[in-house]
């Protein structure tokens, strides 16, 4: 098991600089028009949103689209709900991830135990901080899944339960940085979701927004009205205006040419 330095520096080796000209389709209809054709290959993108905005669906479409459209392998690292429930909900939206799993194009990794580790735990007889052990377990889980699958796309849903165990914002930064560096070392294009803490126009940026290479914000303006905004996407031309989106029978669809009226 690796050790956690608390400084945000893990050297896994094998990193390659992303090709900023290479694009991966997001799998979300209408979204690529806001991002110059898709996500930059090999980048780490944060998807921030309130509950009910479709973060899990967003990640699933990203992985499903890569597998069906391009034959790419994807890993979903779930920290919130059981695999059976997740697969059933996504199948109801037209994404048969079980079939893709049988074809070797999709893997579900259950990392929910990370958030259940007590504040004080033990490795053998040695007492360790539960928060730190949770992080180490997550990073090991990611690396083991990558070594086994060699994925092109990875999604983690969500990192909130882990990082919110650190009340002080300055303590969260090295945790997030370790997650980001671990994902960067895989060479895959990665999404990680987190809870949006404030929807106000003058909100304070969350630590994970500074460390990710791309940021997509999902908001609920009022009942039935949702907006998506590409806030940051390194190496890409962006439409940064909030745009409306729908969650229908086939998942998320971005209305990229429509304005948002509050």
Residue ranges of predicted features:
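C-terminal regions of RecA-like/P-loop NTPase motor modules
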Residues: 2-18, 239-262
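Phosphate-binding/switch region of NTP-binding enzymes
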Residues: 2-3, 184, 188-251
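Pre-Walker A adenine-sensing motif
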Residues: 26-38
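Short hydrophobic/aromatic beta-strand immediately N-terminal to the Walker A/P-loop
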Residues: 45-48
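Conserved P-loop
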Residues: 50-125
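Loop/turn-to-beta-strand initiation segments
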Residues: 73, 105, 150-153, 185-193
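Conserved nucleotide-binding/hydrolysis micro-motifs of P-loop NTPases
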Residues: 80-84, 92, 112-116, 160-161, ...
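Phosphate-binding/switch loop-helix module in NTP-utilizing enzymes
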Residues: 115-178, 182-184
